[in-house]
Amino acid sequence: MTYMKEYYTKIIEALNTISEKEDKEIASAAKSMATAVMNGNSIYLFGASHAGIIAEDAFYRAGGFALFNPIFSPSLMLNVEPVTQTSKLERLEGYGDILLDSKPVKKGDILFIHSVSGRNAVAIDMALTAKERGMGVICLTNLEYSKQVTSRHSSGYRLFELSDTVIDNGGEPGDAVVSIDLLTQKVAPISTIVGSYTIHSIVLKMIEIFEEAGTDIPIFRSANIDGGDDYNSQLFEKYKDQIHYM
């Protein structure tokens, strides 16, 4: 089997696993989010470094849910130089509190955190503070990986230990999945692919709930299709109290 074919096989296995074994957790996450939205609350997404790609993928996206509010920090994104700064800052205790304080979060809101290892301080801080403020916390993490490592937060918690709903991405420790004879480390991570599938699956489950409740479904249209800009502008206006990125 070629390396590329092995990677493809690992991806399909991971997607099948999360679809079959994490369906209840995905449904639980969707129910929490949909309920929050119908109650007038807000949903926030966070991830540091590559984990933050999932928030970017779900946010302001054609065919995507309009009420996802990302929590971005330039110092935790991959366009910062030196890029190693992201690793240092996601381990800095107290930084997650600052980031959450930058948003108008309130009781009943939902915070979705993507962290593969679930060990770093920024995600732990954010989860702890969210819980203190009465928010629901949902995490997407690698349980096998996270259970093998210690927390980098003074509380000793890992992310899955603080979350109301835990979705396991089914990955391997270290995220990469393809073994190479000449290398000591594996190659080709899968968390981004699995994460994208997961967040959009949550949206699809939410839509089923909205359909059953008979409520409107705030989904973006492509801005590159005629009429898309006008339609999206109407969403911004209608849901301005739940949209915090404009």
Swiss-Prot record:
Q: Which GO terms describe its molecular function?
A: carbohydrate derivative binding
InterPro entries assigned to the protein according to its UniProt record, in alphabetical order: RpiR-like_SIS, SIS_dom, SIS_dom_sf, SIS_GmhA/DiaA_subfam, UPF0309
Where do the SIS domain residues begin and end?
33-212
Q: What is this protein called?
A: UPF0309 protein OB3413
Q: Top-down, what is the taxonomic lineage of the species of origin?
A: Bacteria, Bacillati, Bacillota, Bacilli, Bacillales
The similarity annotation says: Belongs to the UPF0309 family.
GO biological process terms, alphabetically, are: carbohydrate derivative metabolic process
